[in-house]
Amino acid sequence: MSMFNKIVKEFQWGQHTVRMETGEIARQAGGAVLVDVEDTVVLATVVAAKNPKPGQDFFPLTVDYIEKTYAAGKIPGGFFKREGRPSENETLTSRLIDRPLRPLFPEGFYNDVQVVIHVVSLNPEVPADIPALIGASAALAVSGIPFNGPVGAARVGYKDGQYLLNPTRSQLATSDLDLVVAGTERAVLMVESEANQLSEDVMLGAVVYGHEQMQIAINAIHELVREGGKPEWDWAPAAKNEPLIAKVTEVALPLLQEAYQLRQKSARSQKLKEVNANVAAALAAAGVEADKVEVGNIMFDLEAKIVRGQVLAGEPRIDGRDTRTVRPIEIRSSVLPRAHGSALFTRGETQALVVATLGTKSDEQIIDALAGEYRDRFMLHYNMPPFATGETGRVGSPKRREIGHGRLAKRALIPVLPKDDEFAYTIRLVSEITESNGSSSMASVCGGCLALMDAGVPVKAHVAGVAMGLILEGNKFAVLTDILGDEDHLGDMDFKVAGTDNGITALQMDIKVQGITKEIMQVALAQAREGRLHILHKMQEAMGHARTELSAHAPRMITMKIHPDKIREVIGKGGSTIQALTKETGTTIDIQEDGTITIASTSTDGMAEAKRRIEGITAEAEVGKIYAGTVLKLLDFGAIVNILPGKDGLLHISEIVNERVKDIKDWLKEGQQVRVKLIQADEKGRLRLSLKAALTEEGGSISPINAGEAAAPAAPAEGSEQQ
């Protein structure tokens, strides 16, 4: 009899067979599920603390998605040969899993929960993020931890008017859409997507299609729980302290209503601090001993009630706008004189300074991904220092949020970038958030597009982004355009839409409640389009098209092609030739395996010289041509003459002049410049040269050395070549 109570569920999901099992591996974890999708295998585990930490005032959920290099049959690089800090993909996937799980934990549950997903086997054609999300959901479901799941997920592609369920990497390469949707049986909770300027209807259809198709995975998790799930925790939220709620409401409600009439964020924030201090003082005076966490939760509920009530009643929003108005926009380009391109995009109290830098092929980011190494020619880095919100805090390496926001902005801009053969530069955008009050990632999209245009990148169209919010109470709802930070915090849905005049390029949606219908999403997307077009109009007014000239400080590039067999001649022994070339001409030279050479420099003369020298190095000697050569070495029977870089030939003593030559030193010396004709090249590459043939053809003459230096030949014949 086996020591394991192993439960296995298998189902067909589109073109893939999915296998889920629990009960054999990681049995001491709260829940553990192994998910296998066509040889991509993930182990998802969850552990929760039995009690919350004292004074805990938020839900401490941690999700760690970890790719093991052995999953792809690799050994890690570096000195230690171990997996190191999380890659960008691991960080983004951790966030992708966290977002749909977090809203499903019950209110008041403050126990530490850690979800860890290991990728232990990888089929390069099957991305591991969807199996990881399903595995995390299943592990939570079988653990018995308080969780209102399970969650399902699906990836949706779009090609030739048809939706694709969980497309392979090869299919994604030609798809117009890469959309991940996650949700429960009843509702969509999360959407993350990149699209090639698709319409709102196509995007909404993809969300609905994905939600329908994920139900088979949700049903399989239910079956797994029925057969192998652990008992549910005996947990209930703490009973509400009604006397405390009444006291806090009595003191705080009128003051909070005053605070939310203040339109300036700084003034409102200061007023809210005063309200909190007044509440604490009133409770102390009344002799009420209250937990700070409990009071904070009551205050949050009161703030949400005020803000949401105002919007649903048709009253002005926190900053005085109606539900459809975008905040005032100011745009300035070429902000930084030495940068290749820059733009300052300000929308209300959110501001992004975005800077574009152009580089060469050698500046591309080399990413050693689990599925294989690849190069990325477009980078977008998002930074939000604490001063952007008027706070002090840590400054250093980017946090998960910054990596996620940068990735969203990058997704939005990728579809409008020129192809590599149209614009060979490597591009780096950096978005410095200098002020933040909501929607800083979408400000990065707008500022990023303008910075690219300022740098002279021929983007296909302007791209703008807008953050939308939603407030839902029963059958009443309101969609908010261009939300503030407080509206994001107090609302039920935060979704960001970026795109051009023609369609959507990126969509990110996070829904905190169940009950958001297709119709509500349809209204929200239509209103988002209205806001996006308004912002696009402002951007087009500020900068109608990309600059036709690059910045004087940006490198120029020329591209040339050589035969791949000649690459080693250009590189030279130990890189000596190319190192000398780059140093002497002040250029950067990149050579591809197919023989494509890119020469970059801020000096056009330097580029021209580098190109001329490479052409000389790779030139083929042609029989019948006359060359300007240099005598390298004298022999008894002739001389070795260099006619091209790396191309030496024999000038036989009989080919110097028509008369008999007794001693070659009477006619030639080492270092002497001579005009010679290539008269023969054999299959081994040996060259035979003739000085007398060149003299005859060009009408020149030569005298013995003791009678003076060689006479200058006549003008070269047409078609001859001179180094």
Curated annotation (Swiss-Prot):
Residues 701-723 are annotated as: Disordered. One of its GO terms (biological process) is RNA processing. It is found in: Cytoplasm. Residues 707-723 have a biased composition (Low complexity). Its cofactor is Mg(2+). Keywords: Cytoplasm, Magnesium, Metal-binding, Nucleotidyltransferase, RNA-binding, Transferase. Residues 624-692 form the S1 motif domain. The keyword Glycoprotein does not apply. CDD domains: KH-I_PNPase, RNase_PH_PNPase_1, RNase_PH_PNPase_2, S1_PNPase. Residues 555-614 form the KH domain. It catalyses: RNA(n+1) + phosphate = RNA(n) + a ribonucleoside 5'-diphosphate. It is an enzyme of class 2 (transferase). InterPro entries: ExoRNase_PH_dom1, ExoRNase_PH_dom2, ExoRNase_PH_dom2_sf, KH_dom, KH_dom_type_1, KH_dom_type_1_sf, NA-bd_OB-fold, PNPase. GO terms for cellular component: cytosol. Mg(2+) binds at residues 488, 494. Its EC number is 2.7.7.8. One of its GO terms (molecular function) is magnesium ion binding. It holds the Pfam family KH_1. NCBIfam families: polynuc_phos (TIGR03591), PRK11824.1 (NF008805). Involved in mRNA degradation. Catalyzes the phosphorolysis of single-stranded polyribonucleotides processively in the 3'- to 5'-direction. Belongs to the polyribonucleotide nucleotidyltransferase family. This is Polyribonucleotide nucleotidyltransferase. It comes from Cupriavidus necator (strain ATCC 17699 / DSM 428 / KCTC 22496 / NCIMB 10442 / H16 / Stanier 337) (Ralstonia eutropha).
